[in-house]
């Protein structure tokens, strides 16, 4: 990612910071688990349609005090500090980098707000030698588990689409977008929602992987054409198919994203706002605008707040495919963000269901 692109991203996303945190601060004040009216509005009975809720959201944003809408006087100082924090930096001993980052996660903060090692970690993730490679078969999408120098494990997700390609259809259409993982990482850092894995773009050499790095199982899910000029990968996952293999370029390079493998254990839960993934069948939350009333006795106050925050984050990246979510030390983390940024021409408002059903 060039410096110009990063500055542009920071400039655009900074404008969203005030809106997101104003919404969160304002609406959370209405969320009280001791009340039976979660889902009711202070202005009367909750509207029974998604469009009605969206109208209420816009109305409340317009009613915010100017202090929540003005740019922070410290904006430029903070922006420059964020930029410097994520600029790749040189290092001497990669083992030291792995050791330091291993102890970063705390609750659902997967990395510190500011740390001089971050730039070194990003540099190491994109440049350290790949020692071995194998399939990472869990989940629905193709990904690889790579071992880098110093025994560091990382996940690699490949590039399926050009950056400007529009994915039509439902919000969950298409394969994972590798750049969505990268953008989610930087957006989380800007919003101080440091719940996503550290991510950076990288190219891998499929010929080198096939001939030198892959284990037997991975090699069995790779193909080489007759004259040995094209190396392809279809991997192993729920939706992986040999006829949908992805191939390297003329130099056998495949672009994608490297995701730092967060240490520790995670718990996985089905999202209360999971979709049915069927055109003719709605999920309970899509039919009942008071759906949150059924959750207030099942989920803790902090869990509901985390899921509301997640919905705002997912709306900003337009990820409507969070059918499950993970927790670390009982706090929600954002491990899979690959279905973001599919269609810039459509805003899928129902991603905000946890917000408008639980807080408005």
Which residues does each PLM region occupy?
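Phosphate/dinucleotide-binding and metal-coordinating scaffold of catalytic cores
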Residues: 1-360
């Amino acid at each position: 990612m060039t410096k110009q692109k990063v500055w542009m991203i920071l400039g655009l996303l900074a404008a969203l910071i005030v809106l997101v945190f104003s919404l969160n601060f304002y609406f959370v004040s209405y969320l009280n688990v001791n009340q039976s009216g979660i889902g009711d509005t202070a202005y009367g009975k909750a509207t029974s349609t998604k469009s009605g809720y969206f109208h209420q959201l816009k109305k409340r944003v317009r009613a915010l005090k100017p202090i929540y809408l003005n740019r922070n006087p410290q904006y430029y100082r903070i922006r420059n500090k964020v930029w410097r924090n994520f600029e790749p930096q040189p290092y001497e001993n990669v083992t030291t980098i792995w050791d330091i980052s291993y102890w970063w996660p705390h609750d659902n903060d997967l990395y510190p707000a500011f740390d001089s090692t971050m730039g070194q970690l990003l540099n190491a993730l994109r440049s350290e030698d790949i020692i071995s490679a194998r399939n990472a078969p869990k989940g629905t999408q193709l990904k690889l588990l790579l071992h880098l120098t110093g025994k560091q494990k990382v996940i690699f997700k490949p590039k399926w689409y050009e950056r400007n390609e529009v994915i039509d259809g439902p919000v969950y259409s298409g394969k994972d977008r590798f750049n969505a993982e990268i953008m989610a990482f930087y957006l989380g850092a800007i919003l101080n929602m440091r719940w996503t894995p550290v991510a950076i773009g990288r190219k891998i050499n499929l010929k080198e992987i096939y001939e030198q790095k892959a284990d037997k199982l991975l090699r069995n899910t790779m193909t080489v054409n007759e004259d040995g000029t094209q190396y392809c990968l279809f991997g192993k996952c729920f939706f992986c198919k040999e006829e949908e293999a992805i191939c390297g370029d003329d130099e056998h390079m495949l672009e994608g994203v490297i995701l730092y493998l967060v240490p520790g254990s995670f718990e996985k839960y089905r999202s209360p706002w999971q979709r049915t993934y069927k055109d003719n069948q709605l999920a309970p939350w899509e039919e009942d605008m008071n759906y949150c009333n059924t959750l207030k006795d099942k989920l803790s106050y902090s869990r509901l707040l985390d899921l509301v925050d997640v919905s705002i984050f997912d709306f900003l990246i337009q990820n409507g495919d969070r059918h499950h979510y993970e927790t670390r030390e009982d706090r929600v983390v954002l491990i899979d963000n690959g279905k973001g940024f599919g269609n810039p021409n459509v805003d899928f408002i129902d991603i905000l269901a946890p917000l408008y059903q639980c807080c408005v």
